[in-house]
Amino acid sequence: MTYQAEIDQMAQTISSQGSPWNAIDAESAARMKLQNRFRTGLDIAKYTAKIMREDMAAYDADPVNYTQSLGCWHGFIGQQKLISIKKHFGTTKRKYLYLSGWMVAALRSDFGPLPDQSMHEKTTVPALIEELYTFLKQADARELGMMFRDLDAAREAGNATEAKRIEHAIENYETHVVPIIADIDAGFGNPEATYLLAKKMIEAGACALQIENQVSDEKQCG
């Protein structure tokens, strides 16, 4: 959908609500919609899973099309990595984030630094996935906000050519949201517990899970 079509669609929605919505500016609302493209973690998981399937097919066709998964343990770290990658390479294509179990155990547990043996909190990794995507969505909102300001400046200057160029860039904007491969520890209980943890991670936005059991001994009752 074009930038103008987004505005027109929003104008129709506002008009259909009558006078209570009259103070809402259609273009401002359309911009907020573009800055908040992903509403839920499942929206992200579906979007990134499609990317990953395409990248796997591209690699099968030619191994030169490999992907790179960069480890991170904090939303800000992931955000700055993707901002830097996009600025340097001009794209985030075939660049993923990877959550390592040992890294999470060592750096993100409320109990402090721990070995990678199922000793950290069960929901630590899902919480980190959600945190990462919050920061990546913020990077999108910031960059699009700068583009909107540039568009307003071009219009005020009467530079129709520059305004059109910026509109085209907005319509073809590449998000900082990339696939996350998450290391899931199956050592927290039985198969159902592993299923529930995997479900939680997908709901947070992960599109690929690496499942392993790092427990050092048998969990027993009594």
Model-derived segments and their meaning:
Residues 2-222:
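Alpha/beta enzyme core
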